[in-house]
Amino acid sequence: MKKTFFQQYILPAALLLATGLTSCKKLIEIPANPPTEIVQSQQFADSATAMTAVVLVYSYVAQQTGSGFGYNDAKLPESTGLSSDELIYTSPNIPDMTAFSGYGLTNLNSVVGQLWTSPYASLYPINAVIEGVNASNGLSAGFKKQITAEMQVARALYYFNLVNLFGGVPLSLSTDYNVTEKLARASVDSIYGQILSDLTSAQQNLSADYPSSGHIRPNQAVATALLSRVYLYRQQWQQAYDAANTVIASGSYSLPSDPNQVFLDGSTEAIWQLPATSLYYVTQEAHDFTPQFGAAPNYIINTWLLDAFEPGDIRTQDWLGQTVVNGDTLYYPYKYKNIQAGSPTIEDYMILRLAEQYLIRAEASAELGNGAAALADINVVRARAGLPASTANPASQTAVLNAIMHERQVELFTEWGHRWYDLKRTGMAAAVLTAEKTGWNANAALYPIPILQLQDDVNLKQNPGY
């Protein structure tokens, strides 16, 4: 019998999670004796077998995950941190990483290839679950809505990153190879249209309660929080404000007073987290950013980011590590601190957190003409960092927006590509990166389509400049 996608790739991952990774909490309950073979026609016959398929998808996603949700090997925080003004790469181990800093990317770059293929590898099983549960005659309408909504949130997040890295990309919503084999690039507007469709549908069908322990499987707030980000990027200011306000006003989340508590399992700030599943280290970020055995860090904080922190900002103590190499003090990202698996302190990958919602509501308020409300929101984030209230003039929209961008820079650094995306969406990239770095040109705002994808799909067209 020919193995299904789940049998061949996802089930072994789930079994590994269930039996071998005792240091990681379970994503959702895995049956005591999970099946070793799932026939395609039986995968969604009832809620038990359907949940097995869902477990497999989450297991697969978690095994790939860096803070970029399925971008572990692709190094999303690292590559976008180098493309922006956050990081400097010091190691000779991955030559293709250096190209991100000097805007020398080509369609042969292996990291760019992973940035493309990693999300599409996860989109296939996500689409398979959506199709499977909705085609089943053995599942209740409520169950179908719940699982479909969870998968829609995951799909929306993948496409959000794809469209911000590459621009228009193939929009694959099916598992039918005849449909997906030669897809052309959908427009940016079409991609965002699908993202909004998925998230608004999910928001309507998810409960306020999380469907499992922890903040792993999405609830309604997860869909709403991601919607607020998407609305912000689309300059739909009132919708962005309303969505962020809904999450903040719910009272379900709070900012820990200690920044060191933010990225821990069960953080009160966490809207959506996934557990790390590596056998050898806790999170990809801790592994990549934290120096070991007295060596220099592979990635150090760029001077421009270091200088952006104000005196007295405790984030420099809690979220920046430092080491002395050859007499030079080097700083590195230290939001995730645990290097070795089995650490007594569990850190989870943070996907969505409350501080971003405050900053989204602040920016939306500023764009809507309410500078005082905007400053009140960024001051909440500043207070946690041990800083006084912003001195920006609330009557000056430019001053308020600059204050918000500054706060996003020092609060969200090396998370999710926020800085890279912010520079591009606000039109600041040329001015900031031309002043700070060499080699910048407008074409560098989008990464090249990988050569293998162009060879496999004749309908794909390369981005300008590559």
Regions found by a protein language model. Name each.
Residues 23-24, 283-285, 299, 310, ...:
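Long, intrinsically disordered, low-complexity segments
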Residues 24-76, 244, 390, 431-466:
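Membrane-proximal, proline-rich intrinsically disordered regions
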Residues 40, 68-91, 208-286, 390-398:
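Short, surface-exposed recognition loops and adjoining beta-strand edges that mediate ligand/DNA contacts
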Residues 51, 59, 92-165, 204-207, ...:
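Conserved, well-structured interaction surfaces
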Residues 98, 241-354, 411, 444-459, ...:
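Hydrophobic-face positions in mid-chain alpha helices that act as interaction patches
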